[in-house]
UniProtKB/Swiss-Prot annotation:
Organism phylogeny: Eukaryota, Metazoa, Ecdysozoa, Arthropoda, Hexapoda
A GO biological process held by the record: ribosomal small subunit biogenesis
Effect of deleting the gene: Lethal at the second larval stage because of defects in pre-rRNA processing. RNAi-mediated knockdown in fat body cells results in accumulation of RpS2 and the pre-40S ribosome in the nucleus and overall decreased cell and nucleus size. RNAi-mediated knockdown in wing imaginal disk results in caspase-dependent cell-death.
InterPro entries in the cross-refs: Ltv1
Annotated protein name in UniProt: Protein LTV1 homolog
C-alpha cells in the first residue's frame, strides 16, 4: 500500500457483523417477507448470559429441589445437573491469531466515538423475543397419561359432528352421579350397588352409546382377560388408555390383514407346487428350449429301426398276439461277433512278459563302406575357429605365413587400377580408401565405384561366413551330444 493513502475501511472504527440464521424465539421467523438470516455483531456474540446464582439458604434450597421432585435430605447440589428448557445457544467467536497481531492497539490510545450505522432494522434480529421457540410450539405432544381416560375417549370418538340433544346437561349430570359408586375388589370380582339388567337397556341404543355410559364404571377395570396386543401396538400405553372405537378397530383389522401378507411363509420364491398352467407346443418358450436342445445334440441321428421295433411290440399287444398285462422288459443283448476274453487273457494284457528292456546299439560299419558312402566329417579348430586340413601347403593344416603365401599365389588375379589385383585383402581396402595426388576425376569415380562394390562383397561374404559357422556349430554340438549318449549307454551294458 502506498504511504499516505487513506484506507477504504478504518479497522479502528469499523464494526464486524456475522450473518446467522434468525432465532426461533424471534416473532418474525414465520414471516415470509422478513429475511431468514440476520446480522449479529461480533462483540455481541461473545457476551454469554450469566446463570442465576443458586440460593444459599438451606430452606430455600430444599423448596427449590421439591419443585423438581428431589426429596433428598443431604448437602449435595442437585441443581447443577438441571438446565433450562429453552436450551439457549450461545455463539463464542474465536478470533484469528494472525489478524489479532496485525490489529493490536496500544494501551495508551483511547477508543473513539461509537460508529454510526445506517442499516435498515430488517437486517437485525427483533428486540423482543418470545420465551418459547417456534419448534417447541409446533412439536406434537406425546400421550398424556395424566389425562382422564374418559376425556381421551371422548376426544378420540368419531361422533363429534353429531347434534346434541336439548337435555344434554341433565344427561351429563346423571352420568356424573355414577362416579360416587363404590367397588369392592377384595375377592377379585367387581361389585356395585347398582344392578344392570339387559331388559332395562334401551333397544335403540347402539354399542357405542352404551360404552360411553359405562366408561366411568370401567375406569378401574383390569385388562387381564383381554388381548390388546397386535402387530403395531405391542402392549403400548396408547392401546391400554384409548378405547378402540368402531373406526379404530376397523383400521386395526386392515393393518392386521396387510401385515399378514408379509409373514415369513409368504416371503421368498413361490413354491413350485403352487405354479399351475400349460403351454401349447408352439409356445415361444417351448420353441426356444427346443432350439437350444437341437443345437447341443447335433450329432444324434434318427434311428428308424429302433422306432419300427417299438411300434411292432405295441401293435402285437393291441392286436391280441401278446398278453397286455404282461410287462415288457427291455434289455441289451451282447453281440456274438464281439471277441470275448477270459480272465487269463485279460490279465496278460496288464503284464510285461513281452517287455525286455535293452539299450539299442548303433550298427557297426566297415571302413571301406563308410569311406565310400560317407565323407569324413569337418572338424573345427578351437584355437582358430577354422576347419582343420583345409589350408594346403601348411604343416598339419596350420595357419602359417608360408601357407598364406601359397594361398595368395593360387588365387585368381583381380582387376583394378594400378596393379590392385596383386595386393591382399587388407592392402586392397587401403588402396581404395586412400586418394592419390595425381588422381583424375575419372579415376576418382572409378575408385569410389570399386570401393562400394568391395564393401558389398565383403558384407555378403561376412554374412555367409556367419551363417556357415552357426550351422557347423549346431551340427558339431549335436554330434557331441549323440556321442556322449552312446558312450554312456555302452558303459552301462
Amino acid at each position: 500500500m502506498v504511504k499516505g493513502k487513506k484506507p477504504y475501511i478504518d479497522r479502528k472504527k469499523a464494526v464486524t457483523f456475522h450473518l446467522v440464521h434468525r432465532s426461533q424465539h424471534d416473532p418474525l421467523v414465520t414471516d415470509e417477507n422478513a429475511p431468514q438470516r440476520v446480522l449479529l455483531e461480533a462483540a455481541a456474540r461473545q457476551q454469554k448470559p450469566k446463570d442465576p446464582e443458586p440460593p444459599t439458604d438451606p430452606a430455600q434450597r430444599q423448596e427449590e429441589l421439591k419443585k423438581f421432585g428431589i426429596h433428598f435430605d443431604d448437602d449435595y447440589d442437585y441443581m447443577q445437573h438441571l438446565k433450562k428448557r429453552e436450551n439457549d445457544v450461545v455463539w463464542e467467536f474465536m478470533e484469528n491469531p494472525n489478524q489479532a497481531r496485525k490489529q493490536k492497539v496500544q494501551d495508551s490510545e483511547k477508543p473513539g466515538p461509537a460508529p454510526k450505522l445506517m442499516l435498515p432494522s430488517s437486517v437485525f434480529a427483533s428486540e423482543f423475543e418470545e420465551s418459547e421457540g417456534m419448534l417447541n410450539k409446533a412439536a406434537p405432544q406425546t400421550l398424556r397419561l395424566d389425562w382422564d381416560p374418559d376425556v381421551v375417549a371422548a376426544l378420540d370418538s368419531d361422533c363429534e359432528n353429531e347434534e346434541l340433544e336439548d337435555d344434554f346437561v341433565i344427561q351429563a349430570m346423571a352420568e356424573g352421579d355414577s362416579d360416587d359408586e363404590e367397588w369392592d375388589d377384595e375377592d377379585g370380582e367387581e361389585q356395585s350397588d347398582m344392578d344392570f339388567d339387559s331388559d332395562d337397556l334401551n333397544e335403540d341404543e347402539n354399542e357405542d352409546e352404551l360404552m360411553d355410559r359405562l366408561a366411568p364404571l370401567m375406569r378401574e377395570r383390569r385388562f387381564d382377560d383381554e388381548e390388546v396386543k397386535s402387530r403395531f401396538t405391542e402392549y403400548s400405553m396408547s392401546s391400554s388408555v384409548i378405547r378402540r372405537n368402531e373406526q379404530l378397530s376397523l383400521l386395526d383389522d386392515r393393518f392386521e390383514k396387510f401385515y399378514a401378507t408379509y409373514d415369513d411363509p409368504e416371503l421368498g420364491d413361490l413354491a413350485l407346487e403352487d405354479i399351475e398352467g400349460n403351454w401349447h407346443q408352439k409356445h415361444p418358450v417351448v420353441m426356444q428350449c427346443f432350439q437350444e436342445f437341437k443345437k447341443k445334440d447335433k450329432g444324434i441321428e434318427y434311428n428308424k429301426e429302433w422306432d419300427r421295433e417299438r411300434i411292432e411290440k405295441y401293435r402285437n399287444v393291441v392286436e391280441g398276439e401278446e398278453d397286455p398285462t404282461e410287462e415288457l422288459v427291455e434289455y441289451e443283448v451282447d453281440d456274438p461277433k464281439q471277441k470275448k476274453w477270459d480272465c487269463e487273457s485279460i490279465l496278460s494284457t496288464y503284464s510285461n512278459i513281452y517287455n525286455h528292456p535293452k539299450v539299442i546299439d548303433e550298427p557297426r560299419r566297415s571302413r571301406r563302406s563308410s569311406a565310400s558312402t560317407n565323407p569324413a566329417p569337418i572338424q573345427i579348430d578351437p584355437k582358430t575357429g577354422l576347419p582343420t586340413n583345409v589350408l594346403r601347403g601348411g604343416v598339419d593344416g596350420q595357419l602359417t605365413a608360408k601357407a598364406l603365401a601359397n594361398l595368395a599365389d593360387e588365387s585368381p588375379a583381380a582387376t583394378g587400377p594400378k596393379s590392385l589385383c596383386a595386393k591382399s585383402v587388407l592392402s586392397t581396402l587401403s588402396v581404395l580408401s586412400i586418394r592419390p595426388k595425381d588422381e583424375t576425376h575419372e579415376e576418382k569415380k572409378e575408385r569410389k565405384r570399386l570401393l562400394k562394390d568391395y564393401r558389398n562383397e565383403r558384407r555378403i561374404e561376412k554374412k555367409a561366413n556367419t551363417e556357415a559357422f552357426k550351422e557347423e556349430k549346431k551340427r558339431q554340438t549335436h554330434v557331441k551330444i549323440n556321442q556322449r549318449t552312446n558312450q554312456q549307454g555302452a558303459s552301462i551294458v
